[in-house]
From Swiss-Prot:
Gene Ontology biological process terms, A to Z: Mo-molybdopterin cofactor biosynthetic process
Gene symbol of the encoding locus: CNX3
Principal place of residence: mitochondrion
NCBIfam families: moaC, PRK09364.1
CDD domains: MoaC_PE
UniProt protein name: Cyclic pyranopterin monophosphate synthase, mitochondrial
Broadest EC class assigned to this enzyme: lyase
Catalysed conversion reaction: (8S)-3',8-cyclo-7,8-dihydroguanosine 5'-triphosphate = cyclic pyranopterin phosphate + diphosphate
Any GO CC annotation of this UniProt entry: chloroplast
Amino acid sequence: MISTLRRAVFLRRFPAVVSPIKRAFSSRIDDEFDPQIMNINELNQEMQSIFGQEPSPDGPGTMDFSELKSSKIEPLRSKNIDFRQQIEYHKSTHSSKNDSQAIEQYAKVASDMSKLTHVGIAGEAQMVDVSSKDNSKRTALACCKVILGKRVFDLVLANQMGKGDVLGVAKIAGINGAKQTSSLIPLCHNIALTHVRVDLRLNPEDFSVDIEGEASCTGKTGVEMEAMTAVSVAGLTVYDMCKAASKDISITDVRLERKTGGKSGSWSRL
């Protein structure tokens, strides 16, 4: 009687015992070949590398956040970066050879940016404060070349362009351009110019117009941009006066030739 009763109890409990074993065995086989499960396993490994443990099977509520690897998580940085603060921050949180090289590169960028007077410490554009500088005599000479081609060159030489005197109009345009520099170049100062000269010369060797512009003032900042704007606007005006005859005209070699005055002293390309 007792033996029969034990057999009946065992048979009733047998499905409950075997079913989880069967499910576990079947699940293990399916998991090894199911790509979705494989992706989940890879995700779990990545989560473990970040948080120090795999997600709990009982849900996110049981995860032990006290064991997070804080070294993997860095605070968000402002978009306007103070490079000196960033360098100190990286020095305090990184120590490997690669990190040291990155810090050195970071410091070099910050040093280079400190030489750009129109760029602030956080990398933002700024207009330089020149109020502390002394007034001094300043000059700048710039030039450019407009290549016309032989046919257009001959028309300009003979003053046969439909719009009129090419060189005369371009000369006035260049002088006016120098006076408008602070309106055209956003971070330039509004300078009280004392003199502007623009000369245009036809060059038969390469069928071009050679343009030279000079600006001067007595003030706290230089006139390099005024001289370069003068020759640039003069060159554009030559193009505008001649474009009806040819579109194949190029403006080249816009550059500063020399400057004088100011704290940096004199400079010459020659």
